């Protein structure tokens, strides 16, 4: 595993101890191997190992784990989001966006909509569609604030929105 040292305490949480969202790339990154190993050892959630494989860039391994997990829990939104993330990690950005749009149609008006919009924004950003990323992150932030979401989620959306706006401004 690759570990980033120092200066990551301000990075948004990625949902698994030892992994945080890099505020430049807006992608999850391992920041502490020991904390991550402890979290994985204590976890019974198959999604945690899938997330790790995605962070490591092992899309094929993540897809295999995901197929098994989806068989056991076909309706899990988190696992369906990971399906699109497998596509993103495989550099199939258009297809990842398409899957996220389908999930967005299903989650519109629910508490999960903000999470889907946040992930959609990351796929847009990774694929170079920064304008669409700004829109998606802004909507995710608005929904999270309006819904009194956890402060860590609001922070993650704010960081992503600011980064996307900065990149958009640099390229204008």
Question: For each predicted feature, which ranges?
Answer:
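Structural signature of alpha-solenoid helical repeat junctions
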Residues: 41, 75, 112, 152-156
């Amino acid at each position: 595993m690759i570990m980033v040292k120092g200066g990551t305490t301000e990075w948004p949480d990625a949902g698994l101890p030892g992994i945080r969202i890099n505020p430049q790339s807006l992608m999850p990154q391992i920041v502490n191997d020991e904390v991550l190993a402890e979290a994985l050892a204590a976890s019974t959630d198959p999604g945690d190992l899938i997330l790790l494989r995605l962070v490591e860039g092992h899309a094929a391994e993540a897809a295999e784990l995901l197929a098994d997990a989806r068989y056991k829990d076909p309706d899990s939104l988190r696992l369906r989001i990971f399906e699109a993330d497998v596509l993103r990690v495989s550099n199939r950005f258009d297809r990842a966006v398409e899957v996220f749009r389908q999930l967005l149609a299903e989650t519109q008006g629910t508490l999960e909509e903000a999470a889907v919009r946040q992930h959609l924004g990351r796929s847009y950003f990774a694929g170079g569609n920064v304008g669409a990323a700004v829109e998606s992150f802004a909507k995710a932030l608005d929904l999270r604030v309006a819904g009194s979401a956890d402060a860590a989620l609001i922070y993650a959306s704010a960081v992503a929105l600011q980064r996307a706006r900065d990149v958009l401004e640099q390229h204008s």
